[in-house]
């Protein structure tokens, strides 16, 4: 117990958040690298990202199409989604990412792991979402540590825009959760506020959470935990 306390993070609410000694995806044998640097920031408003991505051949990607569907928006490296796909084989997962090299590597890792319930798609989600899913297709959505785009004139580049919220209200089944995380308080609060402005979303917890209810950190989340930095989390639901 003492070791756990020493490795804990003090949350803004004063509760100690325990963290494991190593990330849960650390043992995944992922061999393929990128071979080159990938830009950390991509402007989603550039013309090259304004064409909707064609949906994948779902029946080729997922072995069991009837399982509930989890959409991870801005999936980054994909390690979080690969790990949760291993732990929850009764769910199907799609990670959407605007940096193509990361998508290609994540799908290569998926193939190494032999997973048939997870796929990664190169797309601008704000352009492609309605072309990928039909109403009621989604059962869970995560938006974890999106690019904060700090400058005010760049806020229109942020992922969570009113139209995205309206689209998710249509595509999510009633009772489905939307999990939001950021290490930037203003970004997390803005995301939550955008969803709560829509009449189809509500906050059953009436405020931020102290811990990640999914139990698997992203790489950015893990870095924040190691540095004892605060993380702002909201678990909202579709009415």
Swiss-Prot record:
Role this protein plays: Catalyzes the formation of N(7)-methylguanine at position 46 (m7G46) in tRNA.
Gene from which the chain derives: trmB
Record's keyword terms, sorted: Methyltransferase, S-adenosyl-L-methionine, Transferase, tRNA processing
Binding site for S-adenosyl-L-methionine: 72, 97, 124, 147
Organism: Synechococcus sp. (strain JA-2-3B'a(2-13))
HAMAP family found in the cross-reference section: tRNA_methyltr_TrmB
Alphabetical list of PROSITE patterns matching this protein: SAM_MT_TRMB
Protein name from the UniProt record: tRNA (guanine-N(7)-)-methyltransferase
Domain of life: Bacteria
